[in-house]
């Protein structure tokens, strides 16, 4: 007899891990497949000289709101420690620096004091953000939001962030500050609905944190759950081909890359929408065209360095450099000089337990920058590519030293990763957040043309780690059914188990 499961989940990034824990905790039999040798996707860490470094997950928001509630639902909150993270924005052209306080009200007050002529417009802006937050049920799981639809239709769905700021007559560096978190979802202000931006910006601006041990803390909690709940989790394995569809347009079997076969009731993809096309049988032309019309977000070039213990200018937190206040130019790649670079300073522990200071820098990039090496793979790229990486890392370091001169001579390179590195190890396309969240665009989510196939792929509803977890919760509700969903969420949030 072939192995059988209720849910076959493809991928163990944050969406796959969340779906696996939700379904298994609710009593479903789950098999999760990961094509890599280890789980976690962008949540993974790697090590150089015994120092842990983040792959793609650097910080999150909303620990006091929905993200913390999601950890309770998954039964892993006790395994996760949040570290409050400061935010400083540096405009490289003017030299102006803004230290932004945590908390929406504190941020509003701070910006009004810095830009008094725009105070009325700022009050309107933040009132709109609060309205979006208050009317998004998924952000209020403890007060009945768990039993409402995921995202309601709001008036803010029908105006872009850029158009709203135009209406408010907000320009220059203030506009850059309000659009700054666009680099955390990858969609330009002129494309993203204000509501989608507000949902991301509110959590990050209100409660910016990194996790102690980074995304590895979530991966470790997931692996513990796979043992506790007897989850069938397989690495280095994916689907080779699917069985035949029945008259009901459902498929219930698959041959795996390890040569085994498996039967299932439901199958869930968590990959980039275009990766789904490679596996999905009988994808019609209309469906294929819809997916191929999606636009990818930017990628990141990431550089890592060790910082001497006696270095001046080291302050834990996020130091963000913007070469322009025009985030459309930054995130569309229309101006090669328009860049956003985040520098995350943190204290980590080496494998031997000793503390060390690190900085992780991530700068927005686009495929054209590395197109000459598209047909190469990690470990087999030419000297010109290595020179590009070294030059890029040096430029990112020099930009930082302009504004933090006390670090000169105190930074020691550990590693770097281009958009191609991320393409080879994670997403098949190297995009940091999957597809862009354009206004009036219907992203790929839920049921697919094969009637028992579903997707909770990158940016299905909301981008980022918290967005992916909430997307997974919505799909769990659809497949588990309302009765199981209500009982599960009520029990978890009341007991905190």
Predicted regions and their residues:
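A glycine-rich dinucleotide-binding beta-alpha-beta segment and adjacent secondary-structure elements
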Residues: 175-185, 402-462
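N-terminal glycine-rich phosphate/pyrophosphate-binding loop and immediately adjacent elements
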Residues: 2-128
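Helical element adjacent to the flavin cofactor pocket in flavoenzyme catalytic cores
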Residues: 198-251
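Rossmann-like flavin
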Residues: 94-192
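C-terminal segments that line or cap access tunnels to active or ligand-binding sites in enzymes
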Residues: 309-417
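Mid-domain catalytic core of redox enzymes
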Residues: 240-354, 496
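A conserved FAD-binding loop/helix module that cradles the flavin
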Residues: 456-483
């Amino acid at each position: 007899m072939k192995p059988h499961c209720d849910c076959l989940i493809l991928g163990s990034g944050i969406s796959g891990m969340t779906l696996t824990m939700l379904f298994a905790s609710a009593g479903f039999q789950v098999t999760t497949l990961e094509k890599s040798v280890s789980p976690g996707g962008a949540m993974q860490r790697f090590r150089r000289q015994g120092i842990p470094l983040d792959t793609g997950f650097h910080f999150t928001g909303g620990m006091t709101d929905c993200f913390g509630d999601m950890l309770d639902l998954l039964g892993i909150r006790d395994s996760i420690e949040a570290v409050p993270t400061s935010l400083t924005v540096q405009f490289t052209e003017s030299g102006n620096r803004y230290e932004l306080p945590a908390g929406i009200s504190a941020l509003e007050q701070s910006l009004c004091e810095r830009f008094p002529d725009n105070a009325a417009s700022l009050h309107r802006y933040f009132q709109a953000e609060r309205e979006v937050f208050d009317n998004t049920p998924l952000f209020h799981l403890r007060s009945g939001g768990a039993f409402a639809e995921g995202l309601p239709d709001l008036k803010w769905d029908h105006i872009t962030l850029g158009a709203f700021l135009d209406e408010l007559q907000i320009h220059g560096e203030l506009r850059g500050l309000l659009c700054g978190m666009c680099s955390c979802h990858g969609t330009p202000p002129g494309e993203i609905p204000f509501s989608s931006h507000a949902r991301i910006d509110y959590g990050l601006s209100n409660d910016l944190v990194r996790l102690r041990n980074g995304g590895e803390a979530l991966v470790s909690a997931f692996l513990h759950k796979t043992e506790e709940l007897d989850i069938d989790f397989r690495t280095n394995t994916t689907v080779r081909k699917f069985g035949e569809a029945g008259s009901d347009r459902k498929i219930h079997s698959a041959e795996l890359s390890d040569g085994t076969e498996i039967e299932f009731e439901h199958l869930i993809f968590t990959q980039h929408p275009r990766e789904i096309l490679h596996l999905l049988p009988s994808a019609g032309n209309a469906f294929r065209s819809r997916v191929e019309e999606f636009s990818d977000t930017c990628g990141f070039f990431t550089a890592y360095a060790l910082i001497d213990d006696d270095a001046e200018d080291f302050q834990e937190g996020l130091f963000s450099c913007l070469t322009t206040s025009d985030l459309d130019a930054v995130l569309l790649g229309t101006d090669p000089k328009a860049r956003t670079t985040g520098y995350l300073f943190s204290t980590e522990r080496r494998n031997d337990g000793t503390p060390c200071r690190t900085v992780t820098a991530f700068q927005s990039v686009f495929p054209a920058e590395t197109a000459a090496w598209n047909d190469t793979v990690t470990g087999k790229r030419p000297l010109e590519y290595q020179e590009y990486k070294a030059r890029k890392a040096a430029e990112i370091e020099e930009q930082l030293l302009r504004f933090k001169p006390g670090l000169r001579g105190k930074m020691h390179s550990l590693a770097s990763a281009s958009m191609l590195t991320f393409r080879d190890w994670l997403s098949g396309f190297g995009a940091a957040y999957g597809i862009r969240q354009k206004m009036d665009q219907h992203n790929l989510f839920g049921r697919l043309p094969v009637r028992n196939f579903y997707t909770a792929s990158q940016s299905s509803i909301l981008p980022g780690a918290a967005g992916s977890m909430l997307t997974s919760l919505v799909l769990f509700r659809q497949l588990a059914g309302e009765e199981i969903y209500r009982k599960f969420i009520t029990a978890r949030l009341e007991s905190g188990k």
